[in-house]
Amino acid sequence: MKFMKLGSKPDTFESDGKFVKYAVSDLDSDVTIHVGEVTFHLHKFPLLSKSNRMQRLVFEASEEKTDEITILDMPGGYKAFEICAKFCYGMTVTLNAYNITAVRCAAEYLEMTEDADRGNLIYKIEVFLNSGIFRSWKDSIIVLQTTRSLLPWSEDLKLVGRCIDSVSAKILVNPETITWSYTFNRKLSGPDKIVEYHREKREENVIPKDWWVEDVCELEIDMFKRVISVVKSSGRMNNGVIAEALRYYVARWLPESMESLTSEASSNKDLVETVVFLLPKVNRAMSYSSCSFLLKLLKVSILVGADETVREDLVENVSLKLHEASVKDLLIHEVELVHRIVDQFMADEKRVSEDDRYKEFVLGNGILLSVGRLIDAYLALNSELTLSSFVELSELVPESARPIHDGLYKAIDTFMKEHPELTKSEKKRLCGLMDVRKLTNEASTHAAQNERLPLRVVVQVLYFEQLRANHSPVASVAASSHSPVEKTEENKGEEATKKVELSKKSRGSKSTRSGGGAQLMPSRSRRIFEKIWPGKGEISNKSSEVSSGSSQSPPAKSSSSSSRRRRHSIS
């Protein structure tokens, strides 16, 4: 740190308690100056020789026949005044980055200019600022920090602007030419925090592009904003480095606990809004902030009541990176925001596809598939969803994003488990989102035994499961959503469902009279399966017998026998 010593006389200021100071001299004090709570007993001559303002104040006091002067608005307070007073006495004072702003403002207040005395305090401070402070990286940062408490004096004297110019100019230099010291000791961890560089993998003298981040992130948010704005507007700094600085600033200053966030909502609101304002403009091809970081900002913006425009900007940015999100990151209290994010993503994805001369979403698009899996996992984990929000969010995902419906099935099953009060029509609405033909064998087996699913869905699951098991050519045709044969198989599934439902209604008292007959069946799915394919094994073994005897046996008798066999299978 640079410093400057002024004066040559020994310091003879002494204190009488906490609030009284005086200059030891052979002459008695002839003026008393009250600066805030502290009283100074001093001498007029050294003060008047350096300060135009003191000349006026002493003159006004003498007209009122008093030797006391009260100063209530001294910038820098009594400490800055004391340094100025000692300079007037010629005593040794030391100026450095920590006190020079206050002393410069106090000297301006006291009008310690060249017309009062040649080589006065203001002149000497300006020389030190230009030749020492503004040439030093860390001193410029420190001075900029001190200017905040001395506004508007520091702003009017252009100390703030000159500090910002000094800091930003050094940020923009070629890292290879840096000779000054800087702070680089990143040990913060977490998905939204800058990971410490592997120093052992770097060459000894290589300086990273983001060497300046830690020092600048010590600034208060308003000064930080002004520095980053100048750096951005220059167009000479990589946007990735700027985004990294913003992430580090959030990690440095934003509280982790919800209680701290809400208790200091005003300051945290300013922080979030400023960071969002400074985020580099992105597109999907060139995005500089992780989705996890953006979603964290979105969650905080909700908690602290950030402006709606801030949320809109975050929604837009998150939608560009949604394929990188985790389910944990996406668990936002306001489901409507998630809906907007997904809707924006799908709209952007469609535009991209159209720009690439695709008329529809392309099956196999990795980004689209990732988002499809993400939304299904979100639907399964968010227990606060209503039926309408569940359905609406699920319907935002196009078919091409769900080649397999296992994730959607899991989400539907979880929702039914969490909401046992669902009516039949509501369950039907939920299950209408799912295509049972797109379930894997494992999910299909689970669904066939799932007591929460409507009967119609279980029948469809069993039907298409049997098709796959038989390796029927129809099964491969059913996988295509545009095949006319598929419609036939759907109709068959529907007919099987109606068949089971009609049989269930007609069963009525017969099943009641059969007593423990139901215990003979291992499961609900087994009973339904045998309804659809009654006597499957027997029919296979006796097909020739049935074929040869069909012309000899009366139709009514054959029907009765089949009916009895079916009745026993399900009772």
Swiss-Prot record:
Keywords: Cell membrane, Cytoplasm, Endosome, Membrane, Phosphoprotein, Ubl conjugation pathway. GO terms for cellular component: apical plasma membrane; cell periphery; cytoplasm; cytosol; late endosome; plasma membrane. Its main location: other. Residues 29-97 form the BTB domain. The keyword Cell membrane applies. Residues 475-571 are annotated as: Disordered. The keyword Cell division does not apply. The modification Phosphotyrosine is found at Y409. Residues 484-504 have a biased composition (Basic and acidic residues). Induction: Induced, in an ARF5/MP-dependent manner, in the shoot apical meristem (SAM) after auxin treatment of the shoot apex. Residues 540-562 have a biased composition (Low complexity). CDD domains: BTB_POZ_NPY3-like. Residues 210-468 form the NPH3 domain. May act as a substrate-specific adapter of an E3 ubiquitin-protein ligase complex (CUL3-RBX1-BTB) which mediates the ubiquitination and subsequent proteasomal degradation of target proteins. Coregulates with PID the auxin-mediated plant organogenesis. Regulates basipetal PIN proteins (e.g. PIN1) polarization to establish inward auxin transport from the L1 surface of incipient organ primordia; this process is essential for the progression of flower organs development. Recruited to the plasma membrane by PINs (e.g. PIN1 and PIN2) and, in concert with AGC kinases-mediated (e.g. Component of a complex made of PINs (e.g. PIN1 and PIN2), MAB4/MELs (e.g. NPY1/MAB4 and NPY5/MEL1) and AGC kinases (e.g. D6PK and PID) at the plasma membrane. Binds directly to PIN2 and PID. This is Phototropic-responsive NPH3 family protein NPY1. It comes from Arabidopsis thaliana (Mouse-ear cress). The lineage of its organism: Eukaryota, Viridiplantae, Streptophyta, Embryophyta, Tracheophyta.
